[in-house]
């Protein structure tokens, strides 16, 4: 069997821990990706879709009222303005084009908050591909607007009732389906995790976020930011923001995991800082595990961060100290969700609100002129009912 063309590991993390039946499919995907990256026609079509369909470049907005400290500027990279409502659209268009190039007729995907499912459904509608989306039954209930959007665009949404009925279970079902259908179907993984080559493919198709941010910052401020901040579930929006800054030592990279009800409780989703290394979802990565090594259920108010593991490149950036990973609780994210709406007239996704919460906290503690950029990874329309129910419950 042919050797791999790309390194499947980031330090000790990553790899291709899958049933033997899937190894040829992953190698075929890697070869197709490497060839596509060297094909000017493929790159031109991808760039055209990002610009004329998705609406890139997205704005870099200087907040007027959010920063609690006059010495600190907080910019927002506005992935919420992308068609589909979140950063997910970037890499989904790339993978869907890649699937067509490989002659696949069908797309299988998993989704948590429903944003990846919506992005996959719109890409499949655009490119004429059959679409099947696995979604935890709990997430189907808490993300009904996105479920309707997916079905409206022709996707088949399959609720998953096994396990905790959330994202990890949807991932397992999608992978199981692909094991039996990879000759005709492409598994369009939604985050920078899973078996090689997915973490690399997703990073490269999301890299545009950081590339644009760097260019826009130099135009606006004449210098790079002091820190870029992004929420981390599986980690695709964060790695998209970080990728172009990894080799810029003056820029701090900060990922924000969901602390849920508190890091000192079992109700969180912060495997990077509070997990143990294990094998899950085809990769070696930090995992939320109990003493017996069983995967613990993660928890977050935000469906898109409710994942018990994290992408292998984030694990490596954490291990080497190049990136710093913090956390924000449900309550802090809820406060930031409302604060951004009140201060700037922008309703963020609950996922992105975790990053906003940490940026405001960091700004408060800064003692010198500082520029922070937050990746506003998605808009909050999908979360208004969840937040409304919680706030009404709190008021009663």
From Swiss-Prot:
Q: Which organism is it from?
A: Shewanella baltica (strain OS195)
Reactions performed catalytically: (1S,2R)-1-C-(indol-3-yl)glycerol 3-phosphate + L-serine = D-glyceraldehyde 3-phosphate + L-tryptophan + H2O
Family, according to the entry, reads as follows:
Belongs to the TrpB family.
GO MF terms here are: tryptophan synthase activity
A cellular component term from Gene Ontology for this protein is: cytoplasm
Pathway as given in its UniProt record: Amino-acid biosynthesis; L-tryptophan biosynthesis; L-tryptophan from chorismate: step 5/5
- Keywords, ordered alphabetically: Amino-acid biosynthesis, Aromatic amino acid biosynthesis, Lyase, Pyridoxal phosphate, Tryptophan biosynthesis
Cofactor field: pyridoxal 5'-phosphate
Q: Which residues carry this modification: N6-(pyridoxal phosphate)lysine?
A: 88
Quaternary organization: Tetramer of two alpha and two beta chains.
The job of this chain, per UniProt, is described as: The beta subunit is responsible for the synthesis of L-tryptophan from indole and L-serine.
* EC identifiers of the protein: 4.2.1.20
Write the protein's name: Tryptophan synthase beta chain
Per its UniProt record, what NCBIfam families does this chain match? trpB (TIGR00263)
Supply the PANTHER family for this chain: TRYPTOPHAN SYNTHASE, TRYPTOPHAN SYNTHASE-RELATED
